[in-house]
Amino acid sequence: MKTMTMVYFKPKPEYFEQYVEALKKSSPESYILTRDDEVIEIWLQQSVEKLAEQQLEALDWLDDHRYMLEEYSPEEGHTRPYTAFVEQEPSYITEQN
């Protein structure tokens, strides 16, 4: 089943634009959104297995760029990740396929 992952980041103000550009460069298949002082990355995967395959690479990338981020809290760390199963996609997307 398809999954959708949304990860929230809070770049330090002095790194905001640099972080957005780095994320866009490393994630051409993702939606990259900005809202106030946060950056949100959203991507779809065809299965949980595909999601798991990319996790190590994503964590390595995050480790290399962690210095640019503010911590949300000691418990949450530098990201707020959410993953869910896609139960329905908008008709305009499914009609294109």
Give the location of each predicted region.
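Intrinsic disorder/low-complexity segments, especially N-terminal tails and targeting/processing regions
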Residues: I42-L44, E95
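An amphipathic, aromatic/His-enriched active-site/gating alpha helix that lines ligand/cofactor pockets
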Residues: K24-R35, Q46-Y82
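Short, solvent-exposed coil/turn elements at secondary-structure transition points
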Residues: F9, D36, F85-Q88
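Active-site-flanking beta-strand signature of metal-NTP-handling nucleotidyl enzymes
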Residues: T3-K10, I40
